[in-house]
């Protein structure tokens, strides 16, 4: 009898069981989309890399061995997306090397990474419809051109605890409602904050996703500059997200169209996992 392993079936049914982890995230995002408020705007789906902290400020500990999705509002913890400058540099180096290698012949992925370096300034104003909501106006720091003016409505978050990794992550779904009347906000009396966060953003794009590595500089009430470093991945085309979500499970659509949403979320989750698994030591 041969001691070598023969080809094996995926299962006794000849198919691979559904990945419940990815399906759970896909179900969550899909539910947020179909139950969102009836307002104009884009649905933003992003994953931020960070740490889940307990009430004492330390990294949360759970008696699980592998990556785990937490039920919303089930555990008293907070998610912190800030990383150290050393982590920021680590990811910057990693992504820059990836951009260079992705343009070489024989690269594992057929799609190279693109790159843009942005310098942005955010300003926040009160919303007339709701004092708790803020209107965010983003300008190009060099030209002063408004690149975005909108109100962000949080729809929901899913926290993912990764005990074997140096970082955790969070999936967030938001509705970005455009606000066209930004021109009327022209005096300092309209500002909510006395600080205007400056964003130094290195934005990498690959296929249907944007990966943003951002240094945010603001001034606290004492006048001391505060610097935060963040890493996030976002689905790049909200229109594609909504169109695939609309056909998910639609038996009148082709199999390819029915499965497109889950395939998009699968790639989104895999990219978030790759970033988390490449996190080095040195988080706050």
Q: Which positions does each model-derived feature cover?
A:
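Phosphate-end processing signature that detects enzymes handling 5′-triphosphorylated RNA
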Residues: 1-284
């Amino acid at each position: 009898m041969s001691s070598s392993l023969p080809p094996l079936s995926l299962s006794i049914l000849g198919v691979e069981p559904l990945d419940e982890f990815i399906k759970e995230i896909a179900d969550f995002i899909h539910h947020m989309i179909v139950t969102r408020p009836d307002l104009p705007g884009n649905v933003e789906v992003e994953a931020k890399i960070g740490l889940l902290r307990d009430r004492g400020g330390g990294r949360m500990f759970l008696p699980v061995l592998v990556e785990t999705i937490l039920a919303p509002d089930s555990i008293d913890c907070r998610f912190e997306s800030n990383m150290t400058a050393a982590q920021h540099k680590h990811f910057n180096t990693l992504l820059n090397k990836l951009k260079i290698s992705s343009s070489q012949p024989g690269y594992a992925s057929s799609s190279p990474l693109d790159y843009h370096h942005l310098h942005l300034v955010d300003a926040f104003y009160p919303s007339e419809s709701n004092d708790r909501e803020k209107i965010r106006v983003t300008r190009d720091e060099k030209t002063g051109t408004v690149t975005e003016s909108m109100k962000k409505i949080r729809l929901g978050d899913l926290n993912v605890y990764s005990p074997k990794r140096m970082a955790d992550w969070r999936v967030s779904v938001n509705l970005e409602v455009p606000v066209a009347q930004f021109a009327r906000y022209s005096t300092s009396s309209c500002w909510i904050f006395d600080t205007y966060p400056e964003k130094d953003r290195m934005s990498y794009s690959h296929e249907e996703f944007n990966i943003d590595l951002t240094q945010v500089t603001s001034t606290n009430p004492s006048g001391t500059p505060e610097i935060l470093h963040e890493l996030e991945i976002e689905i790049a085309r909200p229109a594609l997200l909504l169109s695939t979500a609309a056909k998910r499970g639609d038996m009148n659509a082709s199999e390819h169209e029915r499965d497109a949403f889950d395939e998009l979320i699968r790639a989104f989750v895999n990219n978030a996992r790759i970033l988390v698994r490449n996190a080095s030591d040195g988080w706050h």
